[in-house]
Structures are given as C-alpha cells and as structure tokens.
From Swiss-Prot:
This is Oxidoreductase ordB. The lineage of its organism: Eukaryota, Fungi, Dikarya, Ascomycota, Pezizomycotina. Induction: Expression is positively regulated by the dothistromin-specific transcription factors aflR and aflJ. It comes from Dothistroma septosporum (strain NZE10 / CBS 128990). The keyword Phosphoprotein does not apply. Keywords: Monooxygenase, Oxidoreductase. InterPro entries: NAD(P)-bd_dom, NAD(P)-bd_dom_sf. The gene is ordB.
Length: 267
C-alpha cells in the first residue's frame, strides 16, 4: 500500500489532495500540518482512519518533516500563502526543509528509496504555459503576484540544484477556484483558467503515480469538464496584490496573513 505525504494539509490544495487520495482506499496519507485540531475540524473524516497519519509541528522541524515523508511514494509541497504577501518565503522554506529531511533519510539509510517531490507552483512562472494569455493580462497578473512569484522561483531553484538526487516536478496551474471535480488533463504546453482545486489535486496525484516522464518538468493541469465556476473574487485579489506590490505597507490592512517584518533598506 503506497503512502503519500501532504505538506500543508489544511490549505486549499492540501485539503483537495487529501480528498482525492481518500477516494482510493489502497492509498495511505501522511498529512503534515501546524495544527492537528484545525485539520480535523476541516476534515473530520480523518479521525480514526487507519490509512491516515497526522504529523503536527513547526515547518522548521526537520525531524517532523522527515518522519512525515519517510517511506512515501511522493511528497506534495502544498504549503502556500494565498495572496501577494510582501517578503513571503513559505515556498522556499518548504523546499529547504524538504531537502534537509531527505538528506536525513538518506543519511539514515543510503539505500532508502526517496519519494518524488511534487511542488505546487504557478503557470505565471513559465512563459510557454502562458503563451495564450494576452500580454497586458500577463503583466498585470505577474505584478499582482510578484512576491509569490519570487518565492516560487527561489523554491524551484533550490530543488533544481538537487536534481542529481531528488526528482521534482513543478505543478503550474492557472487560476484556481473552489468547485467540484469535473475532469482534468496534464499539459506541458499550456494552462487553462479556471481550474478547480480538486482537479488540480487529481492531476498532482496522477503525476505522483506516473513513471519518470515528469522528472524536473513544469506541468500544468487543465480542466476537461464544462461549467467550472469563474473566480470573480480573484478580481479583488488582483487589486490587493497590486497594492502589496507598489505599497507593501497596505498588506497590513488587506492581507490574509499577519504582516511580516520586512528588512530595512540601507542608505
């Protein structure tokens, strides 16, 4: 029975991954979160499920992360900040602790089979995947997610530097929305918006179960069903993202997360 580790089990993508994995009784789930209480509140069906093991702790705790991903077929890096928070480092922090955890596992047993690393990223980072997006829209979206993009780029750089011993795949969907699972396809050529979190998760699991054809590749997930809801709330997020890009201090009043302490500029 294969195990799958989900880092960021309480987030939108993490919750979708857990729901997709629960559809297959032969799959075991290792769910990492900072609050087990919150996870069980969001997904009460996990309580008492013998195929689910919850790992609770700080994202900086290499031992906890190593325990979570040890023996798994794949580890999904789905820890994320949902907006354009200035100074965010959550994606690169997750990449670093994953590398450290895999180093620990390899040090314990040099013959250990390491899991694939399936990384939640964004189509905004790949011009090829965004080739069908109007240029003006592309510029606007990149500005509105500038801090998020910088964090994701650094995360990808960290994992790419370890490609000789860690197999990573970078999942790059377009705009995401909460909706039912309606069908998906994997694409190396283009993104398509909107896409439901559940269809994204199904695509991520498909990559995890594939052979090595997606090693170190940027992979998008596109919807194949019809009637996917348009995320109208994303229009407001674009405005708030632009404010965070040009006037970082506004995030204190508009952001979804506590305002981080930003480094002081020197003269």
């Amino acid at each position: 029975m294969a195990s799958y580790a989900v880092l960021g089990a309480t987030g939108n993508t993490g919750q979708a991954l857990i729901n997709i994995l629960l559809q297959s009784p032969e799959k075991k789930i290792h769910a990492y979160c900072r609050s087990k209480q919150k996870l069980l509140r969001l997904t009460p069906q996990l309580a008492g499920n013998k195929n689910v093991k919850v790992f609770e702790g700080s994202l900086n705790d290499t031992a906890v992360i190593a325990d979570c991903i040890r023996g798994s077929r794949a580890v999904f890096l789905a820890v994320a900040v949902p907006d354009n928070m200035p100074g965010m480092t959550i994606a690169q922090d997750t990449a670093r602790v994953t590398v450290n955890a895999l180093q620990r596992i390899r040090a314990e047993n040099e013959k250990a089979i390491l899991p694939k690393v399936i990384v939640l990223s964004s189509a905004k980072l790949d011009d090829k995947l965004c080739q069908n997006m109007p240029n003006a829209m592309k510029v606007l979206v990149k500005l509105a997610t500038s801090n998020q993009c910088a964090d994701l780029k650094e995360s990808q750089r960290i994992l790419t530097a370890e490609r000789h011993w860690i197999s990573s795949t970078f999942m790059m969907p377009g705009g995401l929305v909460q909706d039912a699972q309606k069908g998906h396809a994997l694409s190396l050529e283009t993104e398509k918006t909107p896409l439901s979190y559940l269809d994204l998760a199904a695509g991520m699991v498909e990559v995890a179960d594939a052979e090595d054809e997606y090693h170190m590749k940027n992979v998008s997930v596109i919807p194949t069903g019809t009637g996917v809801k348009f995320p109208y709330e994303s229009l407001l997020e674009v405005v708030k993202g632009l404010l965070a890009h040009y006037f970082p201090w506004t995030y204190r009043y508009t952001g979804a997360m506590p305002m981080p302490v930003l480094p002081q500029k020197t003269a």
